[in-house]
């Protein structure tokens, strides 16, 4: 028996969301004393509902198994919390992603149905957990309560970033004043094509005006046609594993985080700023959504409202190496202290404690019904009617469930478990 099971809708084909919203939140909860497991939603078995006190469902679409699982959890007063880090719960949001218009009709139809299935499962849950204020505001239309638990860096991310940062500092000391300045754009998926294209006119001007300027593009993106004239100043790399990402971000002087202004993008998190801050690389980002919430313009990052600001502020950062390093240093100080799992552990643990129904266990010698055991089971029924979740622990026996009328009690045996 463990406290919380994370049911994840993402596998190794989409690793970053699972890492931030499952692995990192498990780290937070475990720091607060909770025990956790995770399972991929297609590997979920109905019997697993017996063995946990609460369930976090991350970006899962509704399936027959999940419908049965959710029904059983509700019967046992076990809370269901839906975690989502993007507005992929209603096609009114995803219709605003231009990249989806490039899909084949059958592919788009399947994508839209998956979004609707996620929305259906969300509506069955008791509450939602999410990453930003903008996302929370939209989710309140679908569930009665929403917790904002921002994305944050794990202990592993900190260790990886610290190792890279030491090497970066040694290199900077050896090289002295930089001769080249590198911009970097790190894309998680092809859906970000429209974001980088938004600042292509700015990049054209900067690359043309500054022969010492280089651009690194990492991710599942093709070089925009308008930038091919500057191919000698541009380096393209494919998708990078998260363990190697700090080194690639540290290799650039300015991290670019443009976002087109849509409700979908306003709900996105500040991950790119945090990841760059941990290796002391300054971030220039669009002044919207989580960036506007978290970044202090000119203090620990740079925010840009329009093309003119992008051009002006990027040129300033290109020209002023001391300013770049000062801003990056302040971002590092703040993010390494405040944007990490241990800093946020208390908040999510206290929320979980407040939203957990009373948990009770009846320890019985066995499930053979006798007068005393019958009285214990009547008390168990009364507790369930009052909203508690009840488990039966036996010293021996093979029973996994005890059924009495409409009541289904999970049975955990010391002999079997």
Residue ranges and their predicted role:
Residues 1-55, 61, 357-416:
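N-terminal pre-catalytic "stem/leader" segment of glycosyltransferase-like enzymes
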Residues 8-32, 151-251, 375-381, 386:
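Conserved catalytic-core segment of nucleotide-activated headgroup transferases in glycan assembly
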Residues 71-75, 105-127:
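Membrane-proximal helix-turn-helix segments that form the acceptor-binding/catalytic region
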Residues 82-115, 155-162, 167-168, 176-179, ...:
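Acceptor-binding helix/loop patch of EC 2.4 sugar-transfer enzymes
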Residues 90, 194, 241-248, 253-278, ...:
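Nucleotide-sugar-dependent
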Residues 297-308, 316-322:
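Conserved acidic donor-binding segment of nucleotide-sugar-dependent glycosyltransferases
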Residues 322-353:
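A charged, aromatic-enriched C-terminal amphipathic alpha-helix characteristic of glycosyltransferases
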